[in-house]
Regions:
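Glycine-rich, aromatic-flanked loop segments that form ligand/cofactor-binding clefts
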Residues: 52, 126-128, 157-195, 230
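Active-site-adjacent "subsite" loops/lids of carbohydrate-active enzymes
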Residues: 88-107, 165-166, 177-224
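Active-site groove signature of glycoside hydrolases
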Residues: 128-130, 204-206, 213-247
Length: 484
């Protein structure tokens, strides 16, 4: 274990020694200016992740409180002369993404950075954050607000999307923007005529206005620097109906057409496109396809990755003769992936969502439960995996990740047509790299090792800002904590 940690420690010392001195700019308080207004002006040019962090840092550096006087000069710890402009890190669609979901609250704080760091130590590499959530809210400062929801009064959870992406990229984290597509309470309230089911806040995917809005969000995200856009709820509401309002056009045709338009935006920019899918849809029963419109044969040309939601707890009791599917995680994950691979062949990568929450589990939920699902996914031929905990409780998950770092998938034979645990047939090596095999240090004296990339590089094409010139202050200390 020590042999992996020593090179990392040496690398950190080298980079820290080469880091530039902290930089500051002097700001003269104007009449009517508050500390909050000043922070909003400078936040993109500092290493602070949130406005609250920067407020506290300015107060500490200058020995002041919230009260400011016109003409007063304060130091602001500016480290860049232009806002960050992260770029997408293009990857092949069979990139072995292994990671977790982060809700808007976590993404709006250093929790997401701390999680990215913990993932990298345990051989994982991916964070999925909500860019457009289940309530229809865009979770970052968007340029679309003025046109589409000018009167909506809400504060985005993520104050600095470019900074979040840049910091995660510097950790080697694959950044995925989750976009809830057709379930949208905000737009349903503003434009009820856009809905196909107003009671359920479900937008009509065939409506040109709906498509225009959704494509605008996709364009904005594609230009933000994220590495992948993941579409959720890109389907009709499960209402037992099959009509679209257009003669000769099925629900599956409509969903496939919308997906194609989205793919036409993401593909030229090197942004991967993935979509979530009900676990039950994998069985492709006619009634499910006709109602929700997710016909895999029509969708697969326009998506790079499909993430079936194979949560054992979401299968009804007695499904395929299994008394409580939540207590048989290996069988449902393994068989679901096998069925999906039979449907899409090699055209689309399968990367499942796995259950990292205890719903309906009666036989001991813990690290072993999550580890079992990961092994089932890899044994079935999945390319990576994602863990879902709505509350982002991942302590069990981190332990499971540690346990499967060097796992070699096993080829097995299983089918939910029968019962029993799949039997091992043969072994095959798994896909992993040197970085992902680095173990967690046995001890760090109670302190996480500092992250090495404290000051991401400003892109060369960034324009000069109109802020005052930077003025390094001698013998000053950087306010910015290590990432995370």
């Amino acid at each position: 274990m020590k042999k992996y940690w020593i090179p990392l420690t040496m690398l950190w010392f080298v980079l820290v020694a080469a880091s530039p001195e902290p930089q500051w700019t002097l700001h003269t308080v104007q009449p009517g200016e508050t500390l909050s207004k000043i922070v909003r002006l400078y936040l993109p040019y500092t290493a602070a992740y949130t406005k609250k962090e920067l407020v506290n840092s300015i107060k500490s550096i200058n020995g002041i409180d919230e009260n400011l006087s016109p003409g007063q000069t304060i130091r602001v710890p500016v480290v860049w002369d232009a806002p960050l402009k992260p770029k997408t890190v293009p990857k092949a669609k069979n990139y072995m993404a292994k990671g977790v979901y982060m809700n808007p609250s976590s993404a709006g704080t250093r929790t997401i950075l701390d999680t990215g760091y913990k993932l990298r130590l345990r051989g994982a590499n991916t964070v999925v954050f909500d860019a457009k959530d289940d309530m229809g809210a865009i979770t970052y400062p968007s340029n679309l607000k003025a046109k589409y929801f000018p009167n909506e009064d809400y504060t985005p959870n993520i104050e600095e999307l470019p900074k979040m992406i840049d910091y995660l990229h510097h950790m080697g984290v694959h950044v995925v923007a989750r976009m809830v597509v057709l379930k949208d309470p905000i737009m349903a309230k503003i434009n009820p005529e856009w809905c196909i089911n107003r009671e359920k806040n479900w937008l009509n995917p065939a409506d040109p206005n709906v498509q225009e809005y959704l494509l605008a969000v996709v364009r904005e995200l594609s230009d933000s620097g994220v590495d992948e856009i993941q579409l959720d709820y890109i389907r009709y509401f499960a209402d037992t109906k099959t009509a679209t309002g257009m003669d000769g056009v099925s629900r599956s045709d409509t969903i496939a057409g919308l997906l194609k338009k989205i793919h036409d935006i993401t593909a030229p920019k090197g942004v991967l496109l993935s979509m979530d899918m009900f676990g039950i849809v994998i069985w492709q029963r006619d009634v499910d396809v006709l109602v929700v419109g997710q016909d895999i044969s029509k969708l697969k040309p326009y998506v790079d990755i499909i993430s079936p939601m194979l949560y054992p707890s979401h299968f009804s009791k007695g499904f395929s003769g299994i008394k409580n599917p939540a207590d048989d995680p290996y069988l449902f994950v393994y068989d679901g992936i096998k069925r999906m691979k039979d449907l899409v062949g090699d055209e689309v990568v399968i990367r499942p969502w796995l259950q990292a929450f205890p719903l309906h589990v009666t036989k001991g939920f813990g690290p072993g439960y999550i580890e079992t699902q990961i092994k089932a996914a890899l044994d079935a031929g999945a390319t990576g995996w994602l863990l879902w905990s709505p509350e982002n409780r991942y302590n069990y998950s981190f332990e499971a990740m540690q346990n499967v770092m060097n796992y070699k998938p096993e080829t097995k034979v299983a089918s939910l047509g029968g019962k029993g645990t799949p039997q091992k047939v043969s072994n095959k090596p798994n896909e992993t790299d040197v970085i992902e095999q680095q173990p967690v240090p046995a001890t760090t004296n109670g302190v996480n090792p500092p992250h090495v990339d404290l000051q991401p590089t400003v892109p060369p094409e960034a324009k000069q800002s109109s802020l005052p010139p930077l003025r390094p202050v001698a013998n000053s200390k950087p306010f910015f904590r290590s990432i995370p």
